[in-house]
């Protein structure tokens, strides 16, 4: 886990969660995600973590710090962030992302057909994991209330849990439909232009070829 990347997310969200989990050690979080803090001692407290993250007193004033204790990693704010793969729902990243009214959302298509959107920037603390491992997997889990969230696994280990982003709405679908219609119109415009240009180039090539042959006859 890159603590410098995590610190940037903390500044952006204005929140820092320091979680002591009895069966899993220390986890760090923001409003949008929680990360396994491998290497941090279980005795770390809120003052120490602010020092480790290099937050001065001015920066600290803008950050709400919450230190929480959990009995099990199976229930952290309703999320199961255990290494147990049983709750995993397979999902694959869709190549088309959604950027809407300032929100950038990556979409995952679950194997049951449901879409889950999340902010991929929340994965920045795991940059070293993605770079160094060939076994990173993005899956989806469901909390007791039926809400889905994203889990990042590295082999047999769970590295993070990311909260979903709410982006699909009636207004979004209306704007998306209009955008799709305009893209379709633009596609046919460009196809028509390309066909017209190809016809002109073919005619010019034929004319040039005829002129060359006439010159040879003379």
Where are each of the predicted segments found?
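Intrinsically disordered, low-complexity linker/loop segments enriched in Gly/Pro
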Residues: 1-37
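C-terminal functional regions that serve as terminal interaction/effector modules
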Residues: 30-33, 39, 50-218
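Short, structured "edge-of-domain" segments at secondary-structure transitions
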Residues: 2-11, 41-55
